[in-house]
């Protein structure tokens, strides 16, 4: 794994924090098939960040960025009937809740208040509110 080397270089460059995307489609490539092993081991990464003395701003999406395939939304979501991506849509939010249960279940143990490196969590990213029918409801649902 290159993580230790990369984190050491970041620390040597006098940084004290990093922000990290946690792509949903990387950890659930097929519906219900979760993978947090090997290079996808979030807990191991957070342990290394802590050992390097770096704080972490966690960015689990559900959408992380336009540079990542589908913004990290799993491809298996797209054909779901009645599902509206990145909306206050019960079906979409049900899938997001499963993702959040997995990823936030890991991140909560690494909160700064518990001695871990995670100083914050950003929900969603690059949200274009022009396309969001219920902005307040969507962000509120992610938060809750």
Can you annotate each of these PLM segments?
Residues 2-76, 142-144:
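Aromatic-lined substrate-binding rim segments of carbohydrate-active enzymes
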Residues 47, 51-59, 64-144:
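Active-site region of glycoside hydrolase catalytic domains
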């Amino acid at each position: 794994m290159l993580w230790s080397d990369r984190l050491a270089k970041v620390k040597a460059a006098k940084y004290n924090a990093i922000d990290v995307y946690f792509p949903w489609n990387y950890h659930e490539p097929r519906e219900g098939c979760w993978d947090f092993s090997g290079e996808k081991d979030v807990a191991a990464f957070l342990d290394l960040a802590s050992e390097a003395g770096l704080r972490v701003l966690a960015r689990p999406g559900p959408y992380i960025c336009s540079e990542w395939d589908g913004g990290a939304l799993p491809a298996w979501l797209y054909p779901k009937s009645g599902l509206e991506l990145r909306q206050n849509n019960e079906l979409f939010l049900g899938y997001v809740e499963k993702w959040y249960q997995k990823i936030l279940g890991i991140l909560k143990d690494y909160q700064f208040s518990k001695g871990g490196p995670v100083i914050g969590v950003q929900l969603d990213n690059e949200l274009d509110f022009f396309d969001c029918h219920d902005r307040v409801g969507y962000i509120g649902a992610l938060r809750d």
